[in-house]
Amino acid sequence: MLVENQGRCLLARHRGSAVGSYSTLAGFVGVCESLEDAVRREVAEETGVPVGTVTYMASQGWPFPSGVMIGFRATALAETVHVDGEEVVEARWFTRAELAEHAAAAGRLGREDSIDLYVLRSWLEEPT
């Protein structure tokens, strides 16, 4: 889930990830929950950031457990971040320039084998 606000995107460092390793937020859909509501709930649970508009971006088959990853773009309604400390241990906003600089300095962004990196690259390459 690519959460954005005023030209910045919200990325997180998940428990067990190396310092400087950021990725988009992710989660699961609950029983009888819409995909859009799942995005809003997961972002709020992991970062405390409320989300408004949610837009589909892309999907990817995922082998475990015979699942699918669905990429969404979401608009944050606030900037203040409060990480849950369980799944997410750090989260911060990045401008496109900061994200490109982070990646150039060997900072890790997303997983090469997942939709996560596709979503980030798509956002980085958009004209501003």
Question: Predicted regions: what is each one?
Answer:
Residues 18-22, 84-128:
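Nudix hydrolase/Nudix homology domain
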Residues 25, 39, 43:
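Hydrophobic alpha-helical positions that pack around
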Residues 60-83:
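Active-site-adjacent beta-strand/loop module that shapes the phosphate/pyrophosphate-binding cleft
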